[in-house]
Regions:
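Short, surface-exposed beta-strand-loop junctions and turns on beta-sheet-rich folds
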Residues: 25-26, 104
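Acidic, glycine/polar-enriched metal-coordinating patches/loops
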Residues: 29
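Surface-exposed molecular-recognition determinants
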Residues: 2-3, 10-12, 20, 33, ...
């Protein structure tokens, strides 16, 4: 078998290098690596594109159910809020935020979000929601499942809680996810729902479920996260698109 050793192959003309002919198999041996940022099929259709750092874009719609990383923000010093003002548009019908190990500065307060229709100039979109949770104290003294009106928003423009009564001890935090549907639509109201797990302020656990809607036909193009009282001390928030 003949072998060709080279560091670079370039086409004599145009921008296409053809390896083999119809019916041939081009094999990459075990341990071999093919590096590229854009993968296309024989018809020139892009299957996906990478930015060289592992973030994909332009993913072909045939890859149904893919989770596409958009951006993330890590809170390493105390801040009043975290805003996502880009990446929320009509590209995907569903967006998911993951909030991980979010710790607040204030005891017995609520972590939540609000939406914007003007790229983050204002966060005051009218919304309504339902909220229920299960709580249990660490010492086993009490526990309950309840419809929690503290987490409700009744056609209001303030924050929508995803946790209520969160503690702020050094080892207390919350984690969860928020699903946001068709935020770029100018026809529908924008549905959302969240599920969260966190430390309750009386040394207990809270498991919560929330669902609701942004009562606007305008596109939601930014989301802000904050506590009802006090700063965010630490944690990471991720944004993904779902194909």
């Amino acid at each position: 078998m003949s072998s060709l050793e080279t560091r670079k192959i370039e086409p004599q003309s145009s921008t296409t290098v053809t390896l083999g002919a119809a019916g041939d198999t081009v094999a990459v041996p075990t341990g071999g690596i093919v590096k590229t940022n854009t993968v296309k099929d024989a018809g020139g259709n892009t299957l996906f594109t990478s930015d060289g750092a592992g973030t994909l874009s332009g993913v072909n719609s045939a890859f149904n159910g893919s989770t596409i990383f958009i951006s993330s923000q890590t809170i390493s010093s105390s801040t009043a809020s975290v805003e996502f003002t880009s990446g929320i548009d009509t590209t995907y019908d569903e967006y998911v935020f993951y909030y991980v190990n979010i710790r607040g500065a204030t005891n017995n307060t609520h972590f939540g979000f609000n939406g914007s229709i003007d790229s983050g100039s204002n966060y005051n979109v009218q919304k309504s929601s339902t909220y229920f949770n299960a709580t249990h104290q660490e010492n086993g003294s009490s526990g309950e499942i309840q419809y929690n009106t503290t987490g409700n928003v009744d056609q209001g423009t303030g924050n929508q809680p995803v946790t209520t009564g969160q503690g702020n001890d050094a080892d207390e935090c919350c984690s969860g996810c928020l699903q946001l549907f068709t935020p770029g639509s100018t026809l529908w109201y924008k549905r959302f729902m969240a599920k969260s797990s966190g430390n309750w302020h009386v040394d207990g656990e809270e498991n919560s479920r929330m669902q609701g809607q942004f009562a606007t036909q305008s596109a939601i193009d930014a989301i802000r996260w904050s506590f009802a009282s006090g700063n965010i001390e630490s944690g990471t928030i991720y944004l993904y698109g779902i194909t």
